[in-house]
A protein has these predicted regions:
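Pre-Walker A adenine-sensing motif
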Residues: 3-21
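Hydrophobic anchor at the beta1->P-loop junction of P-loop NTPases
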Residues: 28
């Protein structure tokens, strides 16, 4: 990436610096093209600035294109060891390691018999296969990487004279993939780029890995999930949808397909939390898309779908900040998000516009009798102020707020 088009992502760099030189493998995991490789490049520059000699930083990329004939864990181990010429510490920055069969074995050996500090990236479930628990139990930290936050998006657009609220409209429509954000693509071109990313994920990380034979049925399941972002649904609902189209798929296969999409970081599951019983419920979850542009590249932009994508933005902003995020169930009422981080908790309702009688929108929050922060987040330009302890906040302000 050209230097002038590259924006620092200090939150990720700070996390890597925090774990530097600890005897843990640092795993950066997220959907393809979300910026993991660039974060590694930036961290390499940070290491050099801190005084690490460049010849003690080993950067290797293991893409499927570069490993046409595959690579074994032994070949990976030997290849890295050959580059280590003394007993001083080496910093290993290894990109897309899941393309190496049994990469965990090689990494474990390098941890045990070499003076190393190891950082790896990956884009799919092969990164986190069952064998990682056999070889790296308690010896790795997983760092989720997401597409650009709105704050990061604004850094990409620093030369743009438009207001943050105007830029938010672009962010909603175009999403946060860095390759799109760093250039001024027209909408159609942006969606073509995102469609290419999506197809790469589906082909490389899902259909090929899991040997999906009936691609049409799989794509129909994906379509259902994308159309129902931010809505509770079940595998049975998907089965009924397929039946209405004259298709049939077992509940088990539907669960498998959803799992594959999760493991490729295309969708994220948001469970329900019973605020009365203080327990996580196992039914009627919601799913959110890794980036809003994934919906629009498949379905086209539809203003009617903006409300659900606003939820999508808030969900990932909370995830980026380290919250565990749930749908809140308070007897018969629903809270869009209950976000928990250590002993902190916040409640968030999301709506496109404030209704004339805003009490109706606030009711679900006002019925909560604890003293945790409560927000209604909206695109309404009149948002602002406080109603009985509930803060009314414009989406642009909520997404860039320093703290909640």
């Amino acid at each position: 990436m050209e230097e002038r088009n590259r924006i620092e992502r200090p939150e990720y760099l700070q996390t890597l610096k925090q774990y530097r030189d600890m005897p843990l493998v640092k795993i950066l995991a997220g959907i393809r093209r979300c910026g993991k490789s660039t974060i590694l490049e930036m961290f390499k520059e940070e290491l050099i600035r801190s005084g690490i000699s460049e010849d003690h930083i080993i950067s290797l990329r293991y893409t499927s294109e570069e490993l046409e004939e595959g690579m074994s864990s032994k070949e990976m181990y030997r290849g890295i060891k050959r580059l280590m010429r003394d007993k001083d510490r080496y910093y290993l920055l290894l990109d897309e390691v899941q393309e190496v069969t049994g990469w965990e074995k090689a990494i474990n050996s390098l941890l045990e018999d070499a003076n190393t500090d190891i950082y790896v990236t990956g884009s799919n479930s092969k990164l986190m296969s069952g064998e990682i628990s056999d070889y790296l139990t308690g010896r790795y930290i997983s760092i989720p990487v997401y597409t650009l936050s709105f704050s990061e998006y604004l850094r990409f657009k620093e030369g743009d004279s438009r207001s943050k609220k105007e830029l938010l409209q672009d962010y909603i429509r175009m999403g946060g993939f860095p390759i799109v954000a760093r250039s001024n693509f027209e909408e159609r071109s942006a969606y073509q780029i995102v469609e290419g990313i999506y197809n790469s994920v589906i082909n490389s990380d899902i259909t090929r890995r899991y040997k999906i034979v009936n691609l049409d049925l799989f794509q129909r399941v994906v379509k259902f999930v994308v159309e129902n972002v931010g809505k509770t649904f079940s595998a049975n609902a998907i089965a009924k949808f397929l039946k209405s189209e004259g298709r049939s798929l077992s509940i088990e296969s539907i669960y498998n397909y959803l799992s594959y999409l999760e493991k490729a970081f295309v969708i994220y599951r948001c469970p329900r939390y019973d605020l009365q019983g203080k327990s996580v419920l196992k039914t009627q979850e919601k799913f959110y898309l890794a980036d809003s542009s994934l919906k629009y590249c498949m379905m086209g932009f539809n203003p009617k779908s903006v409300a659900s994508m606003l939820e999508n933005l808030v969900y990932f902003e909370l995830k980026r900040r380290g919250y565990e995020v749930y749908i809140g169930k308070n007897e018969t009422k629903e809270i869009d998000f209950v976000a928990v981080r250590r002993d902190e908790r916040i409640y968030v309702q999301v709506c496109r516009n404030l209704p004339e009688d805003s009490d109706r929108e606030l009711t679900n929050l006002l019925e909560l009798k604890d003293h945790y922060p409560k927000y209604v987040v909206t695109l309404d330009d009149l948002a602002g102020g406080n109603v009985n302890g509930v803060k009314l906040v414009h989406m642009a302000d909520f997404l860039i707020s320093q703290e909640y």
